[in-house]
Amino acid sequence: MTLTKAELADLLFEKVGLNKREAKDMVEAFFEEIRNALEVGDGVKLSGFGNFQLRDKPQRPGRNPKTGQEIPITARRVVTFHASQKLKSDVELAFDGTAA
């Protein structure tokens, strides 16, 4: 199962008591703030959860899988996520080895 933004809003509605519109707006605002920080080059640290960081990847050689022709893969900036040790250990404790 995948948790969606709509499901997060429903959980805020159920557990926190916000109305559905406020819950949806709060989820949207949360992700908008993360997006804004990353767009200006800032990292995002969520204590007990993890860090979103930007990483510059240099240009590198690639290959067209159809033709085999060598083509350059341009330099780019990517977003990376590193889970906190707490999140990793919580997930490990919850995992009982029966997941499909």
UniProtKB/Swiss-Prot annotation:
- Kindly state which keywords UniProt assigns to this record, in alphabetical order: DNA recombination, DNA-binding, Transcription, Transcription regulation, Translation regulation
- Gene3D superfamilies, per the entry: IHF-like DNA-binding proteins
GO CC term, one of those recorded: cytosol
Q: Which GO terms describe its molecular function?
A: DNA binding; structural constituent of chromatin
* Chain segments annotated as transmembrane: none
> Per UniProt, what is one Pfam family of this protein?
Bac_DNA_binding
Q: Name one GO biological process term.
A: regulation of translation
Q: Which family does it belong to?
A: Belongs to the bacterial histone-like protein family.
Describe its assembly: Heterodimer of an alpha and a beta chain.
Q: What does this protein do?
A: This protein is one of the two subunits of integration host factor, a specific DNA-binding protein that functions in genetic recombination as well as in transcriptional and translational control.
Name-wise, this protein is: Integration host factor subunit alpha 2
Record organism: Dechloromonas aromatica (strain RCB)
